[in-house]
């Protein structure tokens, strides 16, 4: 597999309701950063791949379930053909040293592949040059596709040390390929003659993609500029790894401790129990502790009446990476902005955003700002309406002061209860995680005819709580292998994402099924209750499974056309969220965890009435982060004394952001943009939401949300082709027209 420094592997995800963090990226090794397979399998540069996956950095030591190198009879399973069911790797038998050995051997093997292709004396053809490059590096891909996902979900100090060790090696390896003059001459020769050959549409696209990838990675630069680019790539890769590891440490090792139970008034008992367990794990039995994982701190911000505790947690969360300690990332962020601009200018672009967007649907920063601006004004107006409701609720508590950031979620939840008599915790009693997963599978079956057979007891396990399924198509052929990894743990970075241990490919004319995993940190079971989920968590499960469906159904012969544009990749995931709370879907999975009773119509009606409340806040905090991402990367000059926090604050103040709302991620904890993967790309969730909102209308217009003709078109034109066509072409093929923003604004309650 050819690597491309401009691609990623984890798909950083979110759900539309709160634009939450779910990593996604693209490629066979990607994590989509989602999320290895952002619903794309493509060639990515190992270095970028790393940086993206590492976007999350370090955390506390956890016990490893891996064997220790040097044990009697130990062999490196990555260097042997897997004998497991469906050729899945033996995760439990691999050591960190095994990964190092296999990845380095893979680098050596790909170097030989490339030397052979570049030194071929025969006339350059698609088969002996383009296809050969596309196939190169299979051993490296196999090892990387196992290591990178586990470095995000099962990280240990040893994993993180290997991350840092491999980063410069893989960055240099990528540069060696794309700056190989003889190799580029052969690629260019095939590209220049492509129109006069009998190549298929897919082969033409592969040729174009590989040629342009060489261009984007410096093949046309002078020797002097190539050396500059190499150095920039190394520095950027290293800084992204540092940022990611700082953030992981700050997220998992920043604690707020509570000594008295009465200080947790209003917090659901299940969250109190988890805080007690966290404290006990930290040697603080009898106390309650919260770290900066959203599953830990969000319930406090939403339900706890203790204003001082909310303040402490809110500020600790917002200030991750901005505490002037050993894990402070302000200087790292400033350096990244500066180096990315240098690299963009070296490649002939006026700024970093222009360089990145050149290969996206949006094409230009101006198009991105036009979309953000179109939503910003109604979103701020709605947020200001919500602030009035918050002030009203605060006065009931005798607080005649202006709301602060730590008041927003708590009083907004109270206002929602007052307006709609809706209590989300009551709905959660019907959202047990195994039942929700049945609902996820039900939707996939109704839309596409796929079915699932659990093989957890047969498939190799990389984590005891993970489950595995065979996924069968409507004609009973094996389509994919699916792993679900939903429980939080030390060593798992924050958020949710989709990745692949093996991307879809062909071997000797036969389709090889992908091995896809959804990774999340959902609400775990408590002492007396099963794993009951929030609305956001349910939407996240549907979201990540939408990415998984994209990976299951992709059917391409060359990995260089597996990826889609970053601002298109969220369409399959976000459209899948639309079915989560449809009444006929809820009827299948929403059952009370004690009685088995189906969700009462009265509670469903209250949820529907309240579902759009709070969208001003949710939309503004997302847009604020998107603006910050773009504002930093459209700079054409970066001052040596750039203070990224002051820059962010001033830009948002000029736009009129309500004082009580912070960006969803402050710059020093904004892994999407600073960790790589979604640099100048956080807007893509909104871009894709225009597509998914308009796309779901295609189902609704028929009067049947499971309309088979529409579902068949979506699969044929969106899920299956990979990146053979550009995103807008695929969307038009599906919908018959370009998307309109109307449905998005209506869905968010920002328009009538």
Tell where the protein language model's regions lie, with residue ranges.
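C-terminal, non-catalytic "cap/extension" segments appended to globular domains
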Residues: 68-93, 287, 435, 439-453, ...
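Active-site-proximal, well-structured secondary-structure segments within enzyme catalytic domains
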Residues: 202, 206, 238, 245, ...
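N-terminal helix-rich structural modules
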Residues: 17, 65-268
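Short His/Asp/Glu-rich catalytic/ion-coordination signatures at enzyme active sites or charged loops
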Residues: 83-98, 147-166, 189-231, 291-331, ...
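C-terminal motif of bacterial Sec signal peptides marking the signal peptidase cleavage site
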Residues: 55-58
């Amino acid at each position: 597999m050819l690597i491309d420094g401009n691609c990623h592997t984890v798909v950083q995800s979110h759900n539309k309701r709160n634009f939450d963090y779910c990593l996604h990226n693209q490629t066979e090794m990607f994590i989509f950063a989602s999320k290895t397979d952002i619903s794309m399998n493509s060639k990515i540069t190992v270095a970028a791949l790393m940086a993206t996956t590492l976007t999350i950095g370090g955390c506390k030591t956890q016990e490893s379930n891996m064997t220790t190198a040097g044990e009697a009879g130990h062999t490196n399973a990555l260097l042997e053909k897997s004998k497991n069911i469906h050729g899945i790797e033996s995760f439990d038998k691999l050591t960190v040293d095994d990964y190092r050995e296999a990845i380095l051997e893979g680098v050596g093997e790909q170097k030989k592949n490339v030397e052979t292709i570049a030194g071929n004396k025969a006339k350059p053809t698609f088969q002996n040059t383009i296809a050969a490059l596309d196939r190169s590096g299979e051993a490296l891909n196999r090892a990387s596709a196992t290591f990178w996902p586990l470095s995000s979900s099962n990280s240990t100090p040893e994993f993180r040390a290997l991350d840092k060790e491999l980063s410069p090696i893989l960055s240099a390896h990528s540069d060696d390929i794309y700056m190989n003059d003889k190799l580029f001459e052969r690629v260019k020769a095939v590209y220049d003659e492509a129109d006069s050959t009998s190549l298929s549409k897919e082969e033409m696209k592969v040729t174009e993609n590989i040629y342009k990838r060489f261009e984007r990675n410096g093949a046309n630069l002078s020797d002097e500029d190539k050396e500059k680019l190499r150095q920039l790539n190394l520095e950027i890769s290293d800084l992204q790894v540092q940022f990611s590891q700082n953030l992981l440490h700050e997220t998992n090792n920043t604690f707020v401790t509570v000594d008295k139970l009465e200080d947790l008034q209003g917090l659901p008992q299940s969250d109190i129990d988890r805080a007690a367990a966290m404290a006990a794990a930290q040697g603080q039995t009898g106390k309650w502790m919260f770290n900066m994982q959203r599953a830990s701190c969000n319930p406090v911000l939403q339900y706890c009446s203790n204003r001082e505790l909310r303040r402490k947690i809110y500020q600790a969360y917002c200030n991750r990476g901005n505490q002037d300690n050993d894990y402070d990332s302000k200087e790292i962020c400033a350096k990244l902005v500066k180096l990315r601009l240098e690299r963009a200018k070296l490649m002939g672009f006026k700024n970093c955003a222009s360089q990145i967007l050149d290969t996206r649907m949006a094409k230009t920063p101006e198009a991105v700002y036009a979309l953000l601006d179109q939503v910003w004004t109604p979103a701020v107006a709605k947020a200001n309406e919500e602030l009035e409701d918050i002030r009203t609720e605060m006065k009931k508590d005798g607080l005649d002061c202006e709301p602060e950031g730590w008041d927003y979620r708590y009083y907004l939840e109270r206002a929602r209860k007052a307006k709609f008599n809706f209590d989300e915790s009551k709905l959660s009693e019907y959202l047990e995680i195994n039942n929700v997963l049945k609902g996820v599978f039900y939707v996939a079956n109704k839309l596409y005819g796929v079915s699932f057979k659990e093989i957890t007891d047969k498939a190799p396990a990389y984590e005891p709580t993970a489950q595995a399924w065979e996924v069968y198509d409507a004609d009973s052929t094996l389509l994919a292998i699916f792993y679900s990894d939903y429980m939080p743990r030390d060593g798992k970075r924050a958020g949710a994402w989709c990745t692949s241990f093996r991307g879809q490919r062909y071997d000797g004319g036969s389709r090889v099924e992908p091995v896809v995993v959804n990774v999340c940190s959902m609400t775990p079971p408590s002492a007396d209750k099963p794993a009951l989920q929030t609305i956001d968590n349910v939407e996240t499960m549907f979201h990540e499974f939408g990415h998984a469906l994209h990976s299951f159904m992709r059917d391409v012969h060359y990995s260089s056309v597996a990826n889609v544009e970053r601002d298109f990749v969220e369409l399959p995931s976000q459209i899948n969220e639309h079915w989560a709370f449809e009444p006929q879907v809820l009827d299948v999975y929403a059952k009370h965890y004690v009685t088995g009773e189906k969700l009462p119509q009265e509670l469903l009606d209250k949820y529907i009435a309240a579902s759009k409340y709070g969208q001003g806040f949710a939309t503004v905090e997302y847009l604020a982060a998107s603006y910050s991402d773009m504002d930093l990367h459209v700079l054409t000059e970066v001052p040596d004394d750039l203070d990224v926090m002051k820059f962010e604050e001033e830009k948002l103040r000029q736009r009129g952001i309500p004082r009580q709302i912070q960006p969803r991620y402050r710059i020093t904890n904004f892994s999407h943009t600073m960790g790589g993967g979604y640099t100048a790309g956080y807007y893509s969730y909104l871009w894709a939401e225009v597509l998914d909102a308009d796309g779901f209308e295609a189902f609704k217009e028929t009067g049947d949300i499971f309309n088979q003709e529409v579902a068949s078109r979506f699969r044929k034109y969106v899920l299956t082709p990979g990146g053979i066509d550009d995103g807008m072409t695929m969307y038009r093929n599906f919908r018959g027209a370009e998307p309109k923003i109307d449905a998005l604004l209506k869905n968010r309650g920002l328009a009538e």
